[in-house]
Amino acid sequence: MARDATKLEATVAKLKKHWAESAPRDMRAAFSADPGRFGRYSLCLDDLLFDWSKCRVNDETMALLKELAVAADVEGRRAAMFAGEHINNTEDRAVLHVALRDTSSKEVLVDGHNVLPDVKHVLDRMAAFADGIRSGALKGATGRKITDIVNIGIGGSDLGPVMATLALAPYHDEPRAHFVSNIDGAHIADTLSPLDPASTLIIVASKTFTTIETMTNAQTARKWVADTLGEAAVGAHFAAVSTALDKVAAFGIPEDRVFGFWDWVGGRYSVWSAIGLPVMIAVGPDNFRKFLAGAHAMDVHFRDAPLEKNLPVMLGLIGYWHRAICGYGSRAIIPYDQRLSRLPAYLQQLDMESNGKSVTLDGKPVSGPTGPVVWGEPGTNGQHAFFQLLHQGTDTIPLEFIVAAKGHEPTLDHQHEMLMANCLAQSEALMKGRTLDEARAQLQAKNLPASQVERIAPHRVFSGNRPSLTLIHDMLDPYTLGRLIALYEHRVFVEAQIFGINAFDQWGVELGKELATELLPVVSGKEGASGRDASTQGLVAHLHARRKA
């Protein structure tokens, strides 16, 4: 069926009415009255548990949300994506990051062409190159083994590889991985300063080989290599992830060190492609294939499972409920796993660049809120930074906890138990809160004077009723990481379909880039600032004055 705008609008209205009527409901009372609540509002896929029972929903909520998914034709749009249809309508492109991890023998067609053999060819080339670097068969220009790789990219060419490489640290042997993204010269200077060009491989990740930040840093790195080892050494110390073979050749990188990908792969969905080359070199081709396999398992589940048993669909529906119906403007991603410390930033781009839109697929203004602000930090660090606001602030911010049942350090299992206890405690505290009477009783138990009890008790009240969901997996390994990332990718897709927006373009990044190009000669003093707004003129004048001071 096609998207039913009339039914969609009616269901949204029913959801808003339902929220207004059920909002005062106390979550502690809901759990006390319903021992089966956890069982009804949780799902498992193998070892992965998704629990949303601490969100402010009931059976009517879930029935209406499923009705919403049907009206939005989530299943039809999902089928269109997997079939290679051009669902990215503003750029007239297919959206097939799922093909990058498809290990089946089925055809995946884009405009009549089966792309799976192309995907396999690039993956095999990546594996051969990674094995060569890791084994020392592919050496630097002076004959030394490569001990360090530096990935130069930005956005999707950086956030995914950084996140995955850090997350899979227990699977590293060598070489060491480093990442440069910012145009700020301090980033590349600090990265290169402790390294030796003779044992360093630099990967330049830019599809067009024109991305200003990436190419500026790449030229700096090229000069670093050439000044030390000579111009002829450049080819042995660089590789590229790009489709612009002419530009790559002009830079000095041999074609056999160039790895391409396709326009049906968006940047924020590209870690599965050649963009993941630094990850593959760091953890090895076998582990990278396990990473792909985990994502593919989630793809199959998302494609085949019924709506009410489908983890990405349920996660997306809860996300929509929080954003569009409850009116919560942000969501906090809190992985209780230090190695997932870059996951919030990765999901920030995935979600906000995808669903930060204000027009519908047909170019009309949206009728309600779209994607939330996404942010977060790993636990327990966040508890000592911003959890105060989450517990007692005036804004309700849903939390998404992620934790593993087991860690990689068996001799430190007691610390992992403390980590898990903190994660579950925060989830429980947000839901239960603490009443004024409970705060008084706690203070009275300390034999404090009555006046002090009355003075302090209001400050120790927690409203509770603050929603959170929890994802638990066995252990963070390549398969688990791939499955987790694919879960969030498909969650974003589901929310976008209900919002009625295109999750696969990013025109919002263009205007600032255009103006930066115009302003560069102004900032450098080659052109004047006349014709620009008074604020920009004043800022330019101040910068010029301070640079001369």
Curated annotation (Swiss-Prot):
Subcellular location: Cytoplasm
EC number: 5.3.1.9
Gene Ontology cellular component terms for the protein in this record: cytosol
Pathway membership: Carbohydrate biosynthesis; gluconeogenesis; Carbohydrate degradation; glycolysis; D-glyceraldehyde 3-phosphate and glycerone phosphate from D-glucose: step 2/4
PROSITE patterns: P_GLUCOSE_ISOMERASE_1, P_GLUCOSE_ISOMERASE_2, P_GLUCOSE_ISOMERASE_3
Active site: 353, 384, 513
CDD domains, alphabetized: SIS_PGI_1, SIS_PGI_2
GO annotation, biological process: gluconeogenesis; glucose 6-phosphate metabolic process; glycolytic process
One GO molecular-function entry: carbohydrate derivative binding
Pfam families: PGI
Alphabetically ordered keywords of this record: Cytoplasm, Gluconeogenesis, Glycolysis, Isomerase
Statement: the UniProt record of this protein carries the keyword Cytoplasm: yes
PANTHER family recorded: GLUCOSE-6-PHOSPHATE ISOMERASE
UniProt xrefs under HAMAP family: G6P_isomerase
Family, as annotated: Belongs to the GPI family.
Chain's role: Catalyzes the reversible isomerization of glucose-6-phosphate to fructose-6-phosphate.
Designated name of the protein: Glucose-6-phosphate isomerase
